[in-house]
Amino acid sequence: MELVIGRVVKAHGITGEVVVEIRTDEPDRRFTPGASLRAKRSRDGGTGRNYVIEGVREHGARLLVRLAGVNDRDTADGLRGSLFVIDSADLPPIDEPDTYYDHQLEGLRVRTTAGQDVGVVAEVLHTGAGELLAVKCDSGEVLVPFVGAIVTSVSLDDRILEIDPPDGLLDLGS
């Protein structure tokens, strides 16, 4: 499974740098000079192209990245919208209990401890207050805090996430 670690927002300047929106918890590890990145025009098309990073610098909450072979604004602008991806098999295993990669949680069926089906985890949102699970259900979407008091169990093998929601939480989606 491919995981997106960054997205090219636009070209920067005339020498071929690109502005990259970071989508990884490890930008210092993923975006370093000498590292190889695979860029794809979209998630569903082709194998993409590999680039070697020549330079990186911070640009607010984004990065300015110089890629080998991208030496002018036109070439850089051609990368606009490209996604930098890695293979999930390349991720190190997680040693901490009750800790998961986002892609492991996305797609899990959500049910309550009483056995009521709620929906499917569509996305994991990272906020200043903590992680939220965006759960798609028949009535729309419900945001469930990913905390031990609410998420009682996660079974990756069975593809089920069990919650004990406080009163009213599931009513917010309707």
Swiss-Prot record:
Task: Look up keyword Cytoplasm and say if it applies.
Answer: yes
Q: Which GO CC annotations does the UniProt entry carry?
A: cytoplasm; ribosome
Q: Which InterPro entries match?
A: PRC_barrel-like_sf, PRC_RimM, RimM, RimM_N, RimM_N_sf, Transl_B-barrel_sf
- What compartments host this protein? Cytoplasm
Q: Name one Pfam family in it.
A: PRC_RimM
The main location class comes to: cytoplasm
Single Gene Ontology MF annotation: ribosome binding
Alphabetically sorted, this entry's keywords are: Chaperone, Cytoplasm, Ribosome biogenesis, rRNA processing
Q: Which GO terms describe its biological process?
A: ribosomal small subunit biogenesis; rRNA processing
Superkingdom of this protein's organism:
Bacteria
Question: Where do the PRC barrel domain residues begin and end?
Answer: 96-169
Asked whether the UniProt record includes rRNA processing among its keywords, one would answer yes
Q: Which PANTHER family match?
A: RIBOSOME MATURATION FACTOR RIMM
Could you tell me which NCBIfam families the record lists for this protein?
16S_RimM
Q: How does it assemble?
A: Binds ribosomal protein uS19.
Q: Which family does it belong to?
A: Belongs to the RimM family.
Q: What is known of its domains?
A: The PRC barrel domain binds ribosomal protein uS19.
Q: Describe its function.
A: An accessory protein needed during the final step in the assembly of 30S ribosomal subunit, possibly for assembly of the head region. Essential for efficient processing of 16S rRNA. May be needed both before and after RbfA during the maturation of 16S rRNA. It has affinity for free ribosomal 30S subunits but not for 70S ribosomes.
UniProt cross-references to HAMAP family, sorted A to Z:
Ribosome_mat_RimM
Its protein name is: Ribosome maturation factor RimM
Which organism is the protein's source?
Answer: Mycobacterium marinum (strain ATCC BAA-535 / M)
